[in-house]
Amino acid sequence: MIENNICIVGLGLMGGSYAMALTKAGKQVTAIDKNSESITYAEQSGIIECGKTEDYERLLGEADAVVFALYPHAFIDFVRDNQKYFKSGVIITDVTGVKSNVVEPIQSFLREDAEFIPCHPMAGREVSGVEFADDSIFKGANFIITPTEKNTARGLDFAYNLAHLLGVFHISELSVEQHD
């Protein structure tokens, strides 16, 4: 089973495609993005229930899971600056393609009652923006989970269930070093 209330941070192609797939699966999906036009488009298109560009503390506090679709440095900064709003027991994951520069930094400061399970869907297109969101990009794709010693059975279960919900073709587990 996958958590019901999921917040997507970063509504580009990947974040929007995750949101679309999760919404179609009946999850309550909210989003945070710096671009108000992206939020408006996603709300009006039914990709998300609601979104914010600022004053998003409530969205983070209500989320059972948070998916980060940001560049690595922005991902690290966002978690560092906003983890105080995460609910206890939250699972966070990402879509970044290089793990060595995000996993250790995030895990070095992440609260003890939050879990980061690194993931990388091997999917995408040569376009960007939520207006190109398409949950079918995951069909036939590989999905890599890079668990660490800090991950629990619950976190791994979340990652596998997320991958199945997205409809990926193959799921593999690799170490951070093997992935990069």
Where are these regions (language model features)?
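NAD(P)+-binding Rossmann beta1-loop-alpha1 motif at the extreme N-terminus of oxidoreductases
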Residues: 1-58
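Phosphate-coordination loops involved in phosphoryl transfer and adenosine-cofactor binding
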Residues: 2-5, 89, 140
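Hydrophobic Val/Ile/Leu positions in short beta-strands of Rossmann-like dinucleotide-binding domains
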Residues: 7-8, 68, 145
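Short beta->alpha hinge that forms the Motif I/post-I loop of the SAM-binding pocket
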Residues: 34, 70, 95
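Helix N-cap at the beta1-alpha1 junction of Rossmann-like dinucleotide-binding domains, i.e.
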Residues: 36-37, 97, 150
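Rossmann-like NAD(P)-binding element
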Residues: 56-86, 90-91
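Rossmann-like NAD(P)(H) cofactor-binding subdomain of soluble oxidoreductases
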Residues: 80-130
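Internal alpha-helical scaffold of NAD(P)-dependent oxidoreductase catalytic cores
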Residues: 137-180
